[in-house]
Amino acid sequence: LVSVRHLPIYFDDKGAKEAGLLNPASTVKVLEEKGDYVEVEIDGWRKAKGFGRVIQEDFGKNIAVASLLKEASTDANVVTAGEKKVDELTGLPWEKVAAKVWIKKESMLNDINPVWEKSKEAYKTNCSVCHTQPAEAHFDANTWPGMFDGMLAFVNLDTDSEALILKYLQKHSSDYAEGHH
């Protein structure tokens, strides 16, 4: 399943206690369904410093999948850590993680393509007002957030739209595109 907006994630199938937020355009694996809630696994990497609250999509790439509350990020029943390695570029230690949490069955799609199509259209529409927008693969995944933030003051986007467009740009950056840079 793929999220289409920021969604609260919970410790249990009652939604009584929030564990954090799932970011837009994030893929999760369904483990179990119970009433209005679905238990999902969020796979990714986190920096192995501090509380490791932000789960990133790939090793060394700042493409946020979810942000956990401190209590959830340090709970062994929620987060399982695996392989550890150091990012040669930054010297920061990272670890592979899987977080098991619950979400409400809403704002989720079975396919990422409609999300990318809407994000691409929003990028083309909003980011060509002042200038010709750079090709998605012109920057790498970690450069796009800074470039994108610099342009946000000139457009009127809500938080979910901003996050969707940024993730679209990162997932179509030079790190993921064929034949660029």
Please give the residue ranges for each predicted region.
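Short, flexible, mixed-charge glycine/proline-rich loop motifs
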Residues: E117-E121
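The canonical Cys-X-X-Cys-His
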Residues: Y123-P134, I165, L169
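Gly/Gly-Pro-rich "capping" loops immediately C-terminal to redox-active cysteine motifs
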Residues: T132-V155
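Boundary regions of SH3-family modules and the immediately adjacent low-complexity/disordered segments
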Residues: D13, E41-V115
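Beta-loop motif signature
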Residues: L1-D36
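N-terminal intrinsically disordered, low-complexity, charge/repeat-rich segments that act as generic
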Residues: Y123, P145-D149, D160-I165
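C-terminal capping alpha-helices of c-type cytochrome domains
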Residues: V155-H181
